[in-house]
Swiss-Prot record:
Cofactor names: Zn(2+)
One Gene Ontology term, aspect cellular component: cytoplasm
Subunit structure, interactors included: Homodimer.
Domain (J): residue spans on this chain: 5-69
Similarity section: Belongs to the DnaJ family.
SUPFAM superfamilies per the UniProt record, alphabetical: Chaperone J-domain, DnaJ/Hsp40 cysteine-rich domain, HSP40/DnaJ peptide-binding domain
CXXCXGXG motif repeat positions: 147-154, 164-171, 190-197, 204-211
ZnF region ranges: CR-type: 134-216
CDD domains: DnaJ, DnaJ_C, DnaJ_zf
Subcellular localization, as worded in the UniProt entry: Cytoplasm
Name this protein carries in UniProt: Chaperone protein DnaJ
Length: 377
């Protein structure tokens, strides 16, 4: 069955803008999404809409579609005939074709050139205070290393890899292909040696010709003081082994910090909420406040309101790059007693009568604003 025109599928003109394409796709995708539309054929319709949007939303793909329609110019025309040798797939796009015409095919990397090993990632969980003060840790990671038996060659000891007879040691082969521009030659990775340019007749009994084995490596890591959740640290040269004598890759340690039940962290500052009694808030007091650095005495002035914040300078998180420490912010929460005996109630009534039981000007202003909000003023 022939494919419908992509513009027709989305119900737009060929001169439609990118915004018009996106708007049409959103409307149709909501209408035919399988989770919403249970009608027969809705699923296929949704796939057709998605395919059309994928082609028309990308400027390069759209230009290609406008010129060739549903015919893929990368597939050639007419095939290769017997013995044509057209294995290895089509072109990756116009870039490959122009590379072949203008010498870009020479970009093929030397298969025997040294290459850096792959990078690795390790997730380390830290307690709240471990992230603040740092720690020395030892981790174990599985990684690819050169085989000790064959020293990375992949060949049985006493033998050496031979030059690939299919690519002549180049690691690539030339493939002829028909294109809209004519018959061209393109380079492809040799499928017989996987681009290494070598053939191993007798494989190493340890690594079975791979030249590499997986080992578990213990690595000592120094976690710096002040790291935060989601940050990562690079450990140079502790990734996988390089290829053809190339350098090792790097290891990236990603930190996941376990939240604390009392302390909260924002950047290099720490926030805590401390309860005080009604009497302490009214008359003032000195209280002990826990910090990550130890206990600190904090003076509570008389008349302190709930939500008042006090700053303890230098009691936060050490700056990761050095030069200073953050602060700790203490947020006071005044606790009102829930149960009072008769004597306590009488004392409070007497207190209320002497003060007129009125809120202060600041609080009164708040209630005035609230009344206006209810009235819609």
């Amino acid at each position: 069955m022939a494919k419908r025109d992509y513009y027709e599928v989305l119900g737009i003109s060929k001169s439609a803008s990118a915004d018009e394409i996106k708007k049409a796709y959103r409307k149709l995708s909501k209408q035919y999404h399988p989770d919403i539309n249970k009608e027969a054929g809705a699923d296929e319709k949704f796939k057709e809409i998605s395919e059309a949007y994928e082609a028309l939303s990308d400027p390069q793909k759209r230009a290609q579609y406008d010129q060739y329609g549903h015919v893929d110019p990368n597939q050639g025309f007419g095939g290769g005939g017997a013995g044509g040798g057209f294995g290895g797939g089509g072109f990756s796009g116009f870039e490959d074709i122009f590379d072949t015409f203008f010498g870009g095919g020479g970009r093929q990397q030397d298969p025997n050139a040294p290459r850096q090993g792959s990078d690795l990632q390790y997730t380390m969980r830290l307690k709240f205070k471990e992230a603040i003060f740092g720690k020395d840790a030892e981790i174990e990671i599985p990684r690819e290393e050169n085989c000790d038996t064959c020293h990375g060659s992949g060949a049985k000891p006493g033998t050496t890899p031979e030059k690939c007879s299919h690519c002549g040691g180049k690691g690539s082969i030339n493939v002829e292909q028909n294109t809209p521009f004519g018959r061209v030659v393109n380079k492809r990775t040799c499928q017989y040696c996987n681009g290494t340019g070598k053939e191993i007749k007798e494989k190493c009994p340890t690594c079975h010709g791979k030249g590499r084995v997986t080992k578990t490596k213990k690595i000592k890591v120094k976690v710096p003081a002040g790291v935060n959740d989601g940050q990562q640290m690079r450990v140079s040269g502790e990734g996988e082994a390089g290829i053809n004598g190339g350098p090792n890759g790097d290891l990236y340690v990603v930190f996941v910090v376990i939240p604390d039940e009392f302390f909260e962290r924002e950047a290099d500052d720490i926030y805590v909420e401390v309860p005080i009694t009604f009497v302490q808030a009214t008359l003032g007091d000195e209280i002990d406040v826990p910090t990550v650095h130890g206990k600190v005495r904090l003076k509570i002035p008389s008349g302190t309101q709930t939500g008042t914040t006090f700053r303890l300078r230098g009691k936060g998180v050490p700056h990761l790059r050095g030069n200073g420490t953050g602060d700790q912010h203490v947020i006071v929460k005044v606790i009102v007693p829930k149960k009072l005996d008769d004597k306590q109630k009488e004392i409070l009534r007497e207190f209320a009568s002497t003060t007129g039981d009125k809120v202060d000007e600041q609080t009164s202003g708040f209630f005035d604003k609230m009344k206006r909000a209810f009235k819609g003023d």
